[in-house]
């Protein structure tokens, strides 16, 4: 499984990269706007930091606008993957961009049929939003499983990015079904480190070691 961070916060990205477990980053207009950063500069900075796939989203919604914007974004770095919304003009844009060798990530995917359209158009990635599906009473991970089956049936090379991840359980479920990529907020990645028995065990080891060192000191005095 590849782990992407879903953030535009450069400090979070640097920390995750320093741990050696972050393979890429996904952003969207909301995440970038929270950082009060110049879009192009921030995307370049992220690409220089992670040196892996970095998804940056277009804000146009018409075919010509999306293609123009996508070409400009793709020129920012070799690591850029252009996020395109799953709408008719978006699929048309993905087809054009894929022919030009520009990597794309079909975003706002909520059904296996949408993912199928993106794969047929040549999308590099599709991003099903599992958390938002859970919010409306569906089981988001079921959609990922169905997409996996469809892609396997027809040999599509499009990778699945499990998106809209809310908690570590989503990551576990994605891993159990063999998802290609999970993109998550930094706080979810942090939570994956944590287990109460780890803390208890570490504290016990350190206390025992301290007692042993104190014992050695007392013998030498």
Curated annotation (Swiss-Prot):
Q: In which pathway does it act?
A: Carbohydrate degradation; pentose phosphate pathway; D-glyceraldehyde 3-phosphate and beta-D-fructose 6-phosphate from D-ribose 5-phosphate and D-xylulose 5-phosphate (non-oxidative stage): step 2/3
Active-site residues, record numbering mapped to chain: 83
**A GO BP annotation:** pentose-phosphate shunt
What main location does UniProt list? Answer: cytoplasm
Q: Where in the cell is it found?
A: Cytoplasm
Q: What class of enzyme is it?
A: transferase
- What is the protein's known function? Transaldolase is important for the balance of metabolites in the pentose-phosphate pathway.
Annotated protein name in UniProt = Probable transaldolase
The record lists the lineage as: Bacteria, Thermotogati, Thermotogota, Thermotogae, Petrotogales
């Amino acid at each position: 499984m590849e782990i992407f961070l879903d953030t535009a916060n450069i400090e979070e990205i640097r920390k995750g990269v320093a741990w050696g477990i972050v393979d890429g980053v996904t952003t969207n207009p909301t995440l970038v706007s929270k950082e009060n950063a110049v879009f192009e500069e921030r995307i370049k900075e992220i690409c220089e930091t992670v040196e892996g796939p970095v998804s940056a989203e277009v804000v146009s919604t018409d075919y010509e606008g999306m293609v123009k914007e996508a070409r400009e974004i793709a020129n920012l770095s070799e690591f850029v993957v252009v996020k395109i919304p799953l709408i008719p003009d978006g699929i048309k844009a993905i087809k054009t961009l894929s022919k030009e060798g520009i990597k794309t990530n079909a975003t706002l995917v909520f059904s296996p049929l949408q993912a199928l359209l993106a794969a047929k158009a040549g999308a590099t990635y599709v991003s099903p939003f599992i958390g938002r599906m859970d919010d409306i009473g569906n089981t988001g991970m079921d959609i990922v499983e169905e997409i996996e089956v469809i892609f396997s049936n027809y040999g599509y090379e499009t990778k699945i990015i499990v998106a809209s991840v809310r908690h570590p359980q989503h990551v576990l479920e994605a891993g159990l079904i063999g998802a290609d990529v999970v993109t998550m907020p930094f706080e979810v990645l942090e939570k994956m480190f944590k287990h109460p028995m780890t803390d208890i065990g570490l504290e016990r080891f350190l206390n025992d070691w301290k007692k042993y060192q104190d014992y050695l000191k007392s013998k030498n005095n």
